[in-house]
Curated annotation (Swiss-Prot):
Enzyme class: transferase
Location of the protein in the cell: Cytoplasm
Protein name as it appears in the record: Phosphate acyltransferase
One GO term describing the cellular component: cytoplasm
EC number(s) recorded for this UniProt protein: 2.3.1.274
Chief location category: cytoplasm
GO annotation, biological process: fatty acid biosynthetic process; phospholipid biosynthetic process
Keywords per UniProt: Cytoplasm, Lipid biosynthesis, Lipid metabolism, Phospholipid biosynthesis, Phospholipid metabolism, Transferase
Organism: Klebsiella pneumoniae subsp. pneumoniae (strain ATCC 700721 / MGH 78578)
Pathway info: Lipid metabolism; phospholipid metabolism
Length: 365
């Protein structure tokens, strides 16, 4: 295995270094070829490394940062005042080639804006999207994007997300001819926002894409599609709702019947069922798939949940390792170039044409 280096914004997230630094040590224990650059306040980081052994310390380096971007900061203001922040320094390490990927649990809007500014999107991609791979009930996986990088998405962005998601599903997840669907409020063609209907009209014209139509949110975990595309607002709400339900379900499995007097054989049966069901649905535990890749950039950036615990943040680090090892940005770019050798120019939807005509322009910006 080739050695690789990741830059961690250890100050980001709800818990900062108290979670991210122990998660970094956990990741080092799991991967002997990994080197981590811990970006943040040395005074906050150093005490948390007291239990690190010599071998771990040899693969750690603290990179000082002067400030932290607040989780509630407005993205535009955060970007303007980002110099010296742990998030920006971590991204700059990737830009300079000192790290191969960045992991942050910080402000999503700021991470999106800074990553786009510093690392640049792949040729032809308008805006990157947050993507994750979710397990479904058929024991397979579904690629879902956008999960919050872009609150408002026009039809062109949705189409680009669909193409990138399909490439990711085929090249990285290993799904041949992946099925692609748009998340909508119904399966009928006339349902949904204009941007969704316009995106559907364009996707139907792409021979390289296996577009299957609309999918409703209650079918997210059924395995009916391999790629599910939506705007960032809808995707974020859908994902967090699903995670909340799964956490509640797993919690109920553990607590069901506590405090009640039962015969010994009923207690044994209850515990057996709890363990059996917990094993059956453990793959749905949100901690096991924490870490969304900012897809569409020339470098690898992983966004962890802000509320991630140690285990979940270590999973996000592993996601970054896989993104580097699988060369996701390079493979996405190469596949797009092979599919669209004349440039990633997609057919315009009716609303895009009307908007361009109303603005008096004759082409794309």
């Amino acid at each position: 295995m080739t050695r690789l280096t990741l830059a961690l914004d250890v100050m980001g997230g709800d818990f900062g270094p108290s979670v991210t630094v122990p998660a970094a040590l956990q990741a080092l224990n799991s991967n002997s070829q990994l080197t981590l650059l811990l970006v943040g306040d040395p005074d906050a980081i150093t005490p948390l490394l007291a239990k690190a052994d010599f071998e771990q310390r040899s693969r750690l380096q603290i990179i000082p940062a002067q400030s932290v971007i607040a989780s509630d900061a407005r993205p535009a203001q955060a970007i303007r005042s980002s110099r010296g922040s742990s998030m920006r320094v971590a991204l700059e390490l990737v830009k300079e080639g000192r790290a191969q990927a960045c992991v942050s649990a910080g402000n999503t809007g700021a991470l999106m804006g800074l990553a786009k500014l510093l690392l640049k999107p792949i040729e032809g991609i308008e805006r990157p999207a947050l993507v994750t791979v979710l397990p479904h009930q058929q024991k397979g996986k579904t690629v879902v994007l956008d999960l919050g990088a872009n609150v408002d998405c026009d039809s062109t962005m949705l189409v680009q997300f669909a193409v990138m998601g399909a490439v990711l599903a085929e090249e990285v997840v290993g799904i041949a001819n992946p099925r692609v669907a748009l998340l909508n409020i119904g399966e009928e063609e006339m349902k949904g926002l204009g941007s969704i209907r316009d995106a559907a009209a364009v996707l139907k014209t792409l021979p390289s894409l296996n577009y299957i139509g609309y999918l409703e949110a209650n079918e997210l975990l059924t395995g009916k599609t391999d790629v599910l595309v939506c705007d960032g607002f809808t995707g974020n709400v859908t994902l967090k709702t699903m995670e909340g339900v799964v956490r509640m379900f797993l919690s109920l499995l553990k607590s069901q019947g506590e405090g009640k007097k039962r015969s010994w054989w009923l207690l044994l049966l209850k515990r057996w069922l709890q363990k059996s069901l917990a094993r059956r649905f453990s793959h749905l535990n949100p901690d096991q798939y924490n870490g969304a890749c900012l897809l569409g950039l020339r470098g690898s950036v992983i966004k962890s949940h802000g509320a991630a615990n140690q285990r979940a943040f270590s999973v996000a680090i592993e996601q970054a390792v896989q993104a580097v090892q699988r060369q996701i940005p390079q493979r996405i770019a190469a596949r797009l170039e092979s599919l669209y050798p004349a440039g990633f120019e997609l057919p315009e939807s009716d609303s895009d044409v009307n908007a361009r005509q109303q603005s008096g322009t004759n082409g794309h910006d």
